[in-house]
A protein has these predicted regions:
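Formylglycine-dependent sulfatase
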Residues: 1-205
Length: 205
């Protein structure tokens, strides 16, 4: 992560919402929360509703795709019910996806995002060993496959969001409190970011 901050583009003045879904909707749409209306955490797949309307909001992914970029999302979504709206990610501008769709009402297996994580890859749903590993492998592969054309990879990572627990690095001696678990999540997230940077380097980008 430190290397990414050093070599990448860093915004030193920025505003964010202090909670997850409003922040991601703001990032996707470029609008303040009081304009787009997402002012609280809202898990659409679990609680119902229409989710983020592509007929109302334009995401940055749609903008860059219209300019000829190949686009993908790797990470979490939660802001549409992808079981009821299976084309939502495409409508929002993503050609490819590998996401945890969010916990879906009536489908308890979808609540898991880490160990035995429930992941959706280009429409295919499956339970995987560890969700962040599957998503990161998809992200690295996307970079390799599209190194010779303009591309956008949007990566709203699962880590370091709760629920807190172990990672593959410390599962044999799992943390006993939130602070230790969070530290383990940060360490594992740093490892995944390193893998992605390596993929970018190996692609010659």
């Amino acid at each position: 992560i430190d290397r990414l901050a050093k070599e990448g583009l860093r915004y030193e003045t920025a505003w964010s919402n202090p909670i997850c879904t409003p922040t991601r909707v703001t990032l996707l749409t470029g609008q303040y929360a009081f304009r787009h209306g997402w002012t609280h955490h809202y898990d659409v797949a679990r609680k119902g509703g229409d989710g983020l309307k592509w007929t109302t909001f334009t995401t940055f992914a749609r903008v860059v795709r219209s300019a000829g970029y190949r686009t993908a999302i790797a990470g979490k979504w939660q802001i549409n019910n992808l079981r009821r709206q299976p084309d939502a990610l495409n409508q929002h501008g993503f050609d490819e996806h590998c996401v945890w769709p969010g916990a879906e009402q009536g489908f308890p297996e979808t609540g898991e995002r880490y160990f035995k994580g429930y992941i959706m890859t280009n429409g295919r749903r499956e339970t995987v060993s560890y969700g962040p590993d599957t998503i990161n492998a998809f992200a690295c592969d996307f970079v390799r496959r599209h190194k010779d054309q303009p591309f956008l990879l949007y990566y709203p990572m699962l880590l370091t969001h709760g629920p807190f627990g172990a990672t593959p690095l410390n599962k044999d001696n799992p943390p006993q409190d939130k602070a230790t678990s969070y530290a383990g999540y940060v360490t594992y997230m740093d490892r995944l970011v390193g893998q992605l940077i390596d993929a970018v380097d190996k692609a010659g980008l």
